[in-house]
Amino acid sequence: MDDYKDTLNLPKTLFSMRGNLSKKEPNILKSWNENNLYKLIRKKNQEKKIFFLHDGPPYANGNIHIGHAVNKILKDIIIKSKNMSGFDAPYIPSWDCHGLPIEQKVEEKIKSNQGEISTTEFQEKCRKYAQDQVEKQKKDFIRLGVIGDWDNPHLTMNFKNEANIIKTLSKIVQKKHLYQDFKPIHWCLKCASSLSEAEIEYSKKKSDSIIVGFKFKYRSIIEKLFDFQISNKKEIHLLIWTTTPWTLPSSKAISIHPDFQYQLIETERCYLIIAKELVEKTLNTLKIKKSIIRNYVKGRFLEKMICLHPFLKNIDLPVILGKHVTLESGTGAVHTAPDHGLEDYIISQKYNIKTSNIVNFKGEYISNTHDKLDGVNVLEANSIIIELLIKNNTFFHHESLIHSYPHCWRHKSPVIYRATPQWFIDIDQKQLRIKLLQEIKKVRWIPEWGESRIGEMIKKRPDWCISRQRKWGVPMSIFIHKNTRKIHPNTFVFMKKIAKKVELEGLQVWWNIDSKEILGEEYQSYEKILDILDVWFESGNTHTTINYKNKNYTKKNADMFLEGSDQHRGWFMSSLIISTLISEKKPYSEVLTHGFVVDGKGQKMSKSIGNTISPNEIVDTLGADILRLWVASSNYSNDISISNEILKSSSDIYRRIRNTARFMLANISDFDPKKNIISKENMVLLDKWAIGQTKIVQEEIIQHYNNYNFHAVIQRLMYFCSIEMGSFYLDIIKDRQYTLKKHSQERRSSQTAIYYIINSLVRWIAPILSFTADEIWSYLPENNSQYVFMEEWFDKLFYLDQDDLFNYQFWNEIITIKHEINKFLEEAIQNKTINNSLETSIILYVSHELSNKLKILEQETKFIFLTSDIQIKLYDTAPKNAKKSKIVPYLKVSLEKIKGKKCPRCWHYFNFTKKNIKNSDICNRCILNTIGNGEKRIFI
């Protein structure tokens, strides 16, 4: 038997079957960097319409985690797909560089000589630390394949940006939205600083739940009010319930609802006053079995009654009225500590009740609070307070309660409300809250529930506390009068002067500047405020620098903000407030949020649990493209699961896509687009279908990219590679590719189709599998651009003519029939009736209509079904043992083992009865394709 290998057009490519991504990707990155790929893309797209995705600044502290990777990869996918779609989509990476975590890291390093370092020296060390962290994170983000302007990132600590933040605050001052007040705000004991709403997260906490009695001072007045004469010496207690016993030393009043009915109840121990609807529940909690209801009054009649503090001597507490009191839980009365609750503070203001200020910045009671409490941390005081209540006979009940409680987002520790002098942005001044609610309706929220979520937050949020008592941050840069405590009337002008200095020298200017230089002779009457701004104010201001960074960008807002779903409360909110305040416009057109990363069991990632997965480890072992593919495959609108099993699944998907690309590259190794392209008119019909189907798929994929449905992109890609290409088109054309004459029109036709398809496919995967797309691009003949990222979607595809007999409907029917026949063939192979499809003779029993179509294909029909022989007969003539399709109507199939000889060249079976030319052992078709004029194909 002769060896016919040299007569075949076998596939050939250096594009490897294995990705070896972790080894190849660094070299690809090196190429991108050496050729300044980002700059090349900008130059290529400079005349196009801009799409600007504004990068939410991550914090410049610590290694990147898997959540960072998800965020940056999603942004990169969008930006690359927008570039492909004909936009100029720049990407300017951002970093938050100020704030407490950096201060704490620097403090740890200089602990031994902290007292010897000046404020400005400390700030310089913070700046150096932040810059080091930026460089560290930048390297990791670049390794993920994220293309951006890494040489010119947006850093909040850049002098120009620090100055811009001061300018923004000056405009807020000018609009009279800034005020100072002494009221309770969230306070972190570990930060020793105030916190904004965005810095609060709610977690489960075990608290002490207690019921306390406040004795009425004047018994006779209560008797008269309830119209009941008390003959015994039992005390009368107004009961309150609290989960923060530590706030009792600061209690200044008891709030009740004016419209609730309060009952006077006699028990064996004493008389109790409880809201009517909560009496039964409270008595059950206190395990009081015997009680008598003596009378009741409306809450308003108890106003200004005097109670005694439950354990502090000589302190009278008035009963006050407040509609914040509810019947949801407790007793219908709440103790009121204006230092430690916003509602308490507001209701106390109405009664001119002042704060106590007995808790210092460390969270400790100050001297002279109580000899048992002085110097005690408030979060450790509950047991002491319960002992004091028991001693004073005002304690009624204690139990532990697990409930949602505010925690510091940095330290994950419980916070307290603490009244301190702070600076606030007024959210209701000049109908700002209403404007915010109007602006969010003009934004496209993805998912849609984002609108209602941020809307509810806006409705309920308090005024924004923007001041912090720290050193590493942009200074508020304001002066207040020493006596009146009012802002200097020329503050707007002064702040602009200060901003100019900061732009040249940095934020340290404020600590070094002589007040006289700014205020002149007035300097002795004014005090320099050393508070810095909330980091959320800084990050919320970054959108105002878009025009500065992109001079051709004329929009008033960014096209998109994209962050985790926790940013409705954070960056989305702060940016919205500042933008609406300054320009009366929203800062973004679209807001897309993603969920948090959880493990395979749906548990939150935690170092203590040991279920964290480092993105760097994944990149080093599997490659960045696998990580990117995992991100794209996930439904990011919900929490995103990751595990080794899930990553293995991503690797399997990657393998299918890579192998599809490899097959195509291997089959166009001898194809020169300049010479070998076949026109649409001269193409084999199946190749036309392949190109037409690719165009349909491309439109679907582009739509998925435009809708940010990346998991749908992957699903469509997989179906295209596995089914439409892998098990249909590419499977069918192997015979034509390998066995026909090398330069035949029929073979060049399929190569033209493959060339068009791989050119489309490489663009489809480029936003997601960026490294692999770059590698594929390097193997493609005749690339217009140096890199695939400089291209737009492939534009040489064409649709099939729907008026043609062989339109999409025909081919869809053929594909369905092929899948059905494959099932019958697989069954026969499993039963060992046959070994493969080529040694089978297939008889199809079909309808008249389909019979007529298939007969047009003549002998080419067999190539569709990968068989050596096929016969088409009418459905009614099918024998009883023919297999009936359950899916395709009017289709029955008979399979027979073919008679004849196997051609050693094409592996088809043929009738060897007639003597072949020169006694050859190959079939007549192969003779034509080797020494003859070549086989002709029209359809398949």
Curated annotation (Swiss-Prot):
Q: Which UniProt keywords apply?
A: Aminoacyl-tRNA synthetase, ATP-binding, Cytoplasm, Ligase, Metal-binding, Nucleotide-binding, Protein biosynthesis, Zinc
Give the InterPro entries listed for this entry. Answer: aa-tRNA-synth_I_CS (IPR001412), aa-tRNA-synth_Ia (IPR002300), Anticodon_Ile_BEm (IPR033708), Ile-tRNA-ligase (IPR002301), Ile-tRNA-ligase_type1 (IPR023585), Ile-tRNA_ligase (IPR050081), M/V/L/I-tRNA-synth_anticd-bd (IPR013155), Rossmann-like_a/b/a_fold (IPR014729)
Gene that this sequence comes from: ileS
Q: Where do the coiled-coil regions begin and end?
A: none
Protein known as: Isoleucine--tRNA ligase
Where found in the cell?
Cytoplasm
Question: Which residues take part in binding ATP?
Answer: K607
What's the short name of a Pfam family annotated to this entry? Anticodon_1
**Cofactor notes:** Binds 1 zinc ion per subunit.
